[in-house]
């Protein structure tokens, strides 16, 4: 899973595992250590920002915003149904929700964190069964936004970040005290 996140392997459900590039063992170990240290901090930042974004989106969204959110959910569902991880649909969903919040400062913060968020996205969605769970989590957020319920949208976003945070790399750290 970690090698997929690093772009070394490509896993295609039902098709196999493909080598994308050769790994430098020293680089891989160092990157794994850095990632394990960095992920909790990224997830804390995501929770602080994305919970507020979901709440604002529920208050400010338009029908066009809901169309974009629904299209992102459909895209992720199609990717997952095709045996993919749903990376593009996931990214599109978060961008649509951020846009619906109508706050250029928060949009800028999300843009600044984009590379780090991509790291957590790939780590999370590469976990077995995770794409379907993430899609269901996104649907809960979208439902609350559609209802115009900021408190429910915030709770759903917080649950989503908790789901994203449950990754093997961090579980390994807590089990082994590394």
Regions found by a protein language model. Give the residues of each.
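Short coil/turn segments at secondary-structure junctions
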Residues: 30-37, 77, 81, 125
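Short, conserved micro-motifs enriched in small and acidic residues
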Residues: 40, 44, 84, 128
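Juxtamembrane/interface motifs at transmembrane-helix termini
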Residues: 4, 86-90, 126-131, 171-178
């Amino acid at each position: 899973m970690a090698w997929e996140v690093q772009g070394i392997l490509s896993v295609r459900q039902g098709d196999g595992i493909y080598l994308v590039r050769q790994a430098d063992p020293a680089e891989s170990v160092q990157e794994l250590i850095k990632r394990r240290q960095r992920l909790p901090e990224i997830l804390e930042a995501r929770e602080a920002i994305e919970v507020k974004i979901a709440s604002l989106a529920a208050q400010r969204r338009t029908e066009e915003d809901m169309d974009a959110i629904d299209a992102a959910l459909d895209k992720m569902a199609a990717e997952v149904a095709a045996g993919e991880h749903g990376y593009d649909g996931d990214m599109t969903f978060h961008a649509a929700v951020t846009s619906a919040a109508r706050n250029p400062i928060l949009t800028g913060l999300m843009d600044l964190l984009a590379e780090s968020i991509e790291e957590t996205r790939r780590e999370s969605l590469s976990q077995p069964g995770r794409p379907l769970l993430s899609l269901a989590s996104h649907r809960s957020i979208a439902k609350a936004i559609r209802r115009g319920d900021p408190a429910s949208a915030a709770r759903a976003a917080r649950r989503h970040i908790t789901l994203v945070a449950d990754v093997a790399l961090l579980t390994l750290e807590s089990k082994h005290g590394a």
